[in-house]
């Protein structure tokens, strides 16, 4: 029994280390898959040897220990100044804070998108770059991947529930949806893949870079939702979670639609084109 | 079964499950999803328009999640009371359900927010009232009504590692014991994929009052299973010597009842929504 609990706890820790947890990455990919055009779906399925993008929803994390992909280790976060301006990768790389040093996700995303758009890649390179885009664009709809240089201390925020200490960022990554809904992968689609064409147009309007910059003010405000050290009981935790799940579920949906838009743009010549910058 | 129970205990511990509500999230979502599968296109379109295009499943546990923000809801009775002989309804829950359904019937006259909240109440409470953990039976032949079976009936699962009670078993416990990995789509697929029209007609015949009375009769049968639960022999802890042990076979029987109630509640919920929103 004790062994069982330790194993599960260890698994939870592993998932926590990979930004959105595995079930959310799968949910986002499933929403994206649900919104692919037939042509894009056909081309992508061919690229993945018959599998869907859901299978590879967190490719970057699944291959974190592979030497060939070690350059993706700093493709974790995007850093912003106190004015919500993006901190360039070169500057971020020299920062004393590790989360800021790892804030080269936007550059990674852009380089993969540029490579895919320009063509001339092998099948394997095309597959890898597409799967980078899926993992990273998912993560860039998770507030914990936005490192605000003026709020670095707030990244250490924590709370107590029944006298046990929990990290706020880990809550976002693992429980911001699961704290309210026990959705399985297809259930994410049933619940969240139901935007109107007008809503989808609004979500996917602009360039990939503008999506990321546009997320920053909301994700900055997420830090206002917790006074570090707060002690929750069952009822106050529930009240607090009620403020969080509408944001997290909406971000999951938005990520899914935007991934679909960029994949349609890349793999269906008749689909609307999405600008990178 | 023993391993399954141990696994369940571990899952509940790790998940920090502190809230116990009828059926739990998965049960309520299953009922609402079964209902959704049986809605007419018109009814589905109309009810989803009222809740910002979302599925009714999204709001299946909204009442539990948001109860703390609306203190008055905590006072709503979530237990149906029945006479054990006549199965006549006694108490307030019927009045609450009647008022909720009456409000739904006039949904076009309600404000947007009142319409939404009424739908949230209905989708949740209708499921609650199909949960055997939310039925209390009384013998009224004496001077004072006597509650025959208490929902705080305590027992051990066969591993003797975990003390449970009747209410907790029905509040999510039984569903997670049966299929800890299933989501609401899995449950609906398993229960609702091959039912006959005859079954639907039979279960949805009559009024909602008849249906809840039917739940009360079922609950009586469930209570009777507990009556044949053996008491613990040679209990080490004298304080617990009267507790019973529910074994795997009994859990399977409870599972049958739970599955039947989830399905019936979904089919009946669909009938009411179709009647009101299908026009």
Which residue ranges define each predicted feature?
Chain B
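Bacterial Sec-dependent N-terminal signal peptides
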Residues: 1-23
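N-terminal, motif-rich segments that launch catalysis or mediate targeting to/interaction with membranes
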Residues: 21-125, 132, 137-279
């Amino acid at each position: 029994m004790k062994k069982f609990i330790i194993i599960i706890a260890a698994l939870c820790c592993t998932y926590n280390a990979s930004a959105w947890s595995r079930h959310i990455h799968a949910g986002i990919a499933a929403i994206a898959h649900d919104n692919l055009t037939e042509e894009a779906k056909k081309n992508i399925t061919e690229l993945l040897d018959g599998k869907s993008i859901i299978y590879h929803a967190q490719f970057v994390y699944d291959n974190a220990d592979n030497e060939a992909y070690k350059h993706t280790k700093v493709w974790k976060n995007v850093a912003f100044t106190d004015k919500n301006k993006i901190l360039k990768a070169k500057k971020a790389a020299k920062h004393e804070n590790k989360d800021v040093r790892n804030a080269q996700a936007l550059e990674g995303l852009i380089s993969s998108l540029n490579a895919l758009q320009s063509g001339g890649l092998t099948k394997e390179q095309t597959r890898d770059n597409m799967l980078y885009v899926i993992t990273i664009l998912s993560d860039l709809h998770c507030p914990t991947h936005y490192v605000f240089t003026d709020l670095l201390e707030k990244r250490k925020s924590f709370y107590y529930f029944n006298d046990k200490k929990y990290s706020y960022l880990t809550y976002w990554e693992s429980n911001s949806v699961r704290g309210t809904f026990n959705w399985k992968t297809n259930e994410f689609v049933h619940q969240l893949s139901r935007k109107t064409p007008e809503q989808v147009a609004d979500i996917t309007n602009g360039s990939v870079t503008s999506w990321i910059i546009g997320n920053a003010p909301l994700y900055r405000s997420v830090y206002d939702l917790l006074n570090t050290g707060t002690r929750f009981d069952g009822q106050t935790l529930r009240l607090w979670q009620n403020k969080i799940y509408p944001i997290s579920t909406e971000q999951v949906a938005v990520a899914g639609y935007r991934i679909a838009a960029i994949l349609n743009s890349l793999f269906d010549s008749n689909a609307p084109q999405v600008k990178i910058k | 079964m023993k391993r399954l129970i141990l696994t369940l205990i571990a899952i509940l511990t790790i998940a920090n499950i502190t809230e116990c509500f009828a059926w739990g999230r998965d049960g309520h979502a299953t009922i609402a999803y079964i209902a959704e599968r049986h809605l007419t296109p018109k009814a589905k379109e109309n009810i989803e328009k009222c809740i910002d295009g979302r599925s009714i499943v999204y709001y299946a546990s909204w009442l539990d999640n948001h109860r703390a923000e609306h203190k008055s809801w905590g006072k709503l009775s979530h237990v149906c009371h029945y006479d054990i002989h006549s199965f006549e309804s006694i108490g307030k829950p019927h009045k609450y359900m009647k008022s909720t359904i009456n409000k739904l019937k006039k949904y076009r006259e309600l404000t947007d927010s009142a319409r939404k909240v009424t739908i949230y109440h209905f989708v949740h409470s209708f499921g609650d009232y199909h949960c055997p953990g939310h039925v209390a039976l009384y013998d009224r032949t004496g001077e004072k009504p006597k509650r025959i079976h208490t929902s705080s009936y305590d027992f051990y699962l066969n591993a003797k590692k975990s003390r449970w009670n009747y209410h907790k078993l029905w509040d999510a416990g039984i569903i997670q014991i049966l299929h800890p990995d299933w989501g609401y789509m899995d449950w609906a697929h398993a229960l609702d994929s091959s039912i006959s029209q005859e079954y639907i007609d039979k279960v949805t015949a009559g009024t909602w009052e008849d249906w809840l009375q039917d739940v009360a009769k079922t609950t009586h049968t469930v209570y009777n299973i507990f009556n044949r639960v053996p008491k613990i022999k040679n209990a080490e802890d004298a304080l617990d010597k009267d507790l019973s042990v529910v074994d795997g076979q009994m859990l399977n029987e409870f599972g049958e009842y739970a599955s039947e109630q989830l399905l019936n509640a979904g089919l009946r919920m669909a009938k009411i929504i179709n009647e009101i929103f299908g026009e």
